[in-house]
Design a protein with these regions (language model features):
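Small beta-barrel nucleic-acid-binding modules, primarily SNase/OB-fold domains
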Residues: 14-276
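Bacterial N-terminal signal peptides
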Residues: 2-13
Length: 276
């Protein structure tokens, strides 16, 4: 084996199995057209840049969630064949290299269009100083009319579990905080988490700390130990304080209870459902 091949193989062996793609350093476009729509909040521009729409989270296609197809089709109809304008916040790209952009066609915002139809909920990636009023108003009109996601059981509480990472990268025992859930405040106002708790499928539970979550903001709920991040100008994060993994890698269920013991939301993790 020659020296070049040896060096290439050595470099590959040091690359983490779950490494994210490199973040492009090209300028972020402010106008473009759309070449492909993946789902309701993710699409590709004619420039080749992939966009993650700001201020809305739409249902997933994989695993299939209610109104995921409708959200994708609404985004296609809104964007296809039209020039789009893109506006950025403090962070232009996420860790996957996707542009984080508010998207307009003419004077109409795609995020508001989706929220109005109940095809997504407000989803804030801090820091973001956008005036949330039109987004919240659109969401509340959809909720009042029980349109889209607001007609389903999963969206009747104040909080919604948007993702459940029960299987951490590598050995869970040495990466306890690699287990986490992302929980979003889908209500119209701030939620105080004091008195809330989260339980696994066996009934074991962990209390949430005192924390006010603004509407649309998310909390990363880590299994392990760490210092809570309670400043809403950054990503909120709490630590359940376990020294061992909490969630079963094959099948488990996370259930959030409010201070009165009422179920706020629940989400299952299954190898079959999650595809891993």
């Amino acid at each position: 084996m020659n020296l070049v091949a040896t060096l290439v193989l050595a470099a590959l062996s040091l690359t983490p199995a779950h490494a994210r793609p490199p973040v492009p350093n090209t300028p972020a476009p402010v106008t473009s057209t759309v070449s492909n729509v993946y789902d309701g909040d993710t699409f590709t521009l004619a420039t080749g840049d992939r966009v993650r729409l700001r201020l809305v989270n739409t249902p997933e296609l994989k695993p299939a969630e209610a109104y995921g197809i409708e959200a994708r089709e609404a985004t296609k109809a809104f964007l296809s064949g039209k020039p789009v304008q893109l506006a950025y916040g403090a962070t232009q790209r996420d860790g996957y290299g996707r542009l984080l952009a508010a998207v307009k066609v003419g004077s109409d915002l795609l995020a508001v269009h989706l929220l109005e139809r109940g095809l997504g909920h407000l989803f804030v990636i801090p820091p973001d100083e956008t005036d949330m009023t039109p987004y919240l108003e659109a969401q509340e009109r959809a909720r009042a009319g029980k349109r889209g996601i607001w007609s389903t059981p999963e969206f009747q509480g104040s909080l919604h579990i948007t993702s459940f990472h029960a299987n951490a990268d590598g050995d869970d025992r040495s990466n306890v905080n690699g287990e986490y859930l992302r929980v979003c405040n889908i209500s119209s106002g701030p939620v105080q988490l004091a008195g809330f708790r989260i339980a696994d499928i066996s009934g074991a539970s962990w209390d949430f700390p005192e924390l006010i979550v603004p509407p649309g903001h998310t909390i990363k709920v880590h299994s392990g130990q760490g210092v809570h991040q309670l400043d809403p100008t950054e990503q909120l994060a709490i630590y359940l304080g376990s020294s061992d993994p909490i969630w079963n890698n094959k099948d488990d269920r996370a259930t959030i209870y409010d201070r009165y013991g009422k179920v706020v939301d629940t989400r299952t993790h299954s190898v079959q459902k999650e595809g891993r």
